[in-house]
Amino acid sequence: RGAEAALRAVAVDHRLLGGVARSAPEHHRLCVWGPDTGLPGGTRHMAETDSVQVLQHGVALGIDTFREFRRAMSLAEGQPDKIICHQVGATHQRTILNSLCLPPDRDFTTFRHLGNIGTVSLPITAAIAAERGFLEAGDMVGFLGIGSGLNCLRLGVEW
């Protein structure tokens, strides 16, 4: 759903240039949610996340995916011009930007006022960034998503 929403955020006058998706399903148990079936007749839900391991393995997957994205998109040094990342929090943002050698001023964030809103955070953040003039015509924008499972998507959009 997050990838679908990200594609819908790309307006008619913007062009999807391509992308790369990778997964690391061996880490699928790091974030688990759903009905707690251990209770007879219960409809309670449970959620468990090993946030330290999600960050560690997510960043490793993110680095590999970004490396492949840069190669597949034939990105010039210094590209993408702007980035919109999955919005989790300050620690995750700082860690992934440092790991990818991306300067923080290229990233637009919303987690400080919207919080972690899951799979819709990337398209909502892109819409707000566009509305506020952060994304400019001609920018090569990298949409960078990492989610539990672990799954990683990198899209290149000509703004």
Task: Indicate where each model-derived feature is located.
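Short, conserved, surface-exposed binding loops centered on an aromatic residue
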Residues: 38, 72-75
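Hydrophobic helix-cap positions at the C-terminus of alpha-helices
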Residues: 6-7, 69, 73, 129
